[in-house]
Amino acid sequence: YDERNAEAVSVAGQLSVQWAENAVNKYLNTTLSTGNKDYIVAMDTDSLYVCLDSLVSRIGITDKEKIIEFLDKACGRIEEVIKKNYDELAEYVNAYQQKMVMKREVIADTGIWTAKKHYILNVHDSEGVRYEEPELKIVGIEAVKSSTPQACRQSLKEIFNIIISGTEDDVISYIEKFKEKFFGLNMEEVAFPRSVNGLKKYKDPATIYRKSTPIHVKGSLIYNHILRTKKLTRKYPTIKEGEKVKFTYLKDPNPTGDKVISITNSLPKEFELEKYIDYDTQFEKAFIEPLKGVLDVIGWDTERR
């Protein structure tokens, strides 16, 4: 391969999206007589997120459905503007053929960005499909990750809906209720799912595991060690390379002498570790930390002051 080809693709992509950004800003500033206002709230490799509040305010529509209908038509006009400017770009770079096209994806009334490619949108229309009730589009946020405990996935989605449509007090009340429910769940429901790799690499005959062992691998090695110590390997299979596991933090002190344990399906009762599950740490890391990533952006708290 030739690195210059890769660089050319990257630079061409950057030029294309920036060209579209300039075209949309110029069109909206001219249409709304706003001078040099930046209407682009976020950009990605091949997409623009455009704020059209000023346009909606100008026409004086308040009915939500009519606003969505108006924005659908307005986006059609913006598509035409982008197409015209891409024709000019093709001529500018002496392109063999003009192949660049941008289409409207979603219409949303609320959006929260925590970082690049990490956002929540309250979507009313997606590529021409109109929703009776708005649906959340969640990208890069913890709720949609497979590493999030099962007990938290739906609750994170629910609380994101509250953040979009409710108040800070509503959010705090939900957290308080879910925390009470969370502390009543079993270990399997609150543990972090992972795939375990490197059991041989990180195993140490003297100390069970080596330094810098990933926490879920550490928990797996401890689990296997306890099985062998308690002579339970005929009753429960050991954790093997490549298997799916779940790990949870433990209160200190506890019978393992460590802060974590991993399992495959369920925690063997012979381990006698149920009362040592650290629900406070699990709740903080599985629910509060990803939630704070969103709440910090809008200046809300997770508890009453």
Predicted features by range, described:
Residues 2, 10-43, 52-305:
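DNA-dependent DNA polymerase catalytic subunits
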Residues 49:
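Catalytic core of nucleotidyl cyclases, primarily class III adenylyl/guanylyl cyclases
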